[in-house]
């Protein structure tokens, strides 16, 4: 496996953050949670930050994903990963997570609607699911009795005992 590197990108405009975010997930249309104020938790998370540091995940000069380090007005550090599905399945995500978890044991993840495989991937990597940010159209997960649509989940990493 090639080494990955993180290239710091300082985001000056909130529109740049959301544009990168859409591109990272291949979302071509406007994110549904931005359509009304009460359902804008996802975008409001960025608006409340006082520093947005975006890291591009590079492998052999190719961007394969992004990492967003957010420090909000309450000085809570949260990490956001958007990693291409192909590279995630190849295991690059695991190495990236290990590096980030050296700084924090909590990871905030946005799961696009329908990408339940992303949630399962984090579970397999040793995260316990407390909360996650998802689209308001997440009602199909109600059967699993895991979430309330619109609530934020936080994934908390716990070392696996040997």
Regions found by a protein language model. Name each.
Residues 3-19:
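A short beta-loop-alpha structural element at the N-terminal edge
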Residues 9, 81-83, 111:
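Hydrophobic adenine-recognition pocket in adenosine-nucleotide-binding enzymes
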Residues 22-44:
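Conserved GNAT-fold acetyl-CoA-binding loop/helix
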Residues 56, 62-70, 77-82:
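Conserved beta-strand in the GNAT
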Residues 83, 89-102, 120, 124:
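Conserved acetyl-CoA-binding loop-helix of GNAT-fold acetyltransferases
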Residues 94, 114-141:
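Conserved active-site alpha-helix within GNAT-family acetyltransferase domains
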Residues 103-114:
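Conserved GNAT acetyl-CoA-binding A-motif
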Residues 113-116, 135-162:
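C-terminal "cap" of GNAT-fold acetyltransferases
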């Amino acid at each position: 496996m090639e080494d990955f590197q993180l290239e710091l990108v300082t985001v000056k405009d909130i529109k740049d953050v959301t544009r990168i975010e859409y591109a990272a997930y291949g979302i071509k249309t406007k994110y549904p949670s931005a359509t009304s104020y009460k359902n804008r938790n996802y975008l409001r998370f960025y608006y409340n930050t006082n520093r947005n540091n975006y890291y591009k995940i590079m492998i052999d000069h190719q961007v394969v994903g992004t990492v967003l380090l957010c420090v909000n007005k309450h000085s809570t550090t949260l990490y956001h990963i958007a990693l291409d599905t192909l590279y995630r399945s190849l295991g690059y995500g695991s190495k990236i997570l290990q590096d980030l978890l050296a700084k924090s044991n909590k990871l905030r993840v946005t799961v696009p609607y329908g990408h339940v495989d992303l949630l399962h991937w984090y579970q397999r990597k040793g995260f316990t699911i407390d909360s996650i940010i998802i689209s308001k159209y997440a009602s199909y997960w109600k059967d699993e009795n895991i979430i309330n649509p619109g609530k934020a989940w936080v994934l908390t990493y716990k070392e696996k005992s040997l």
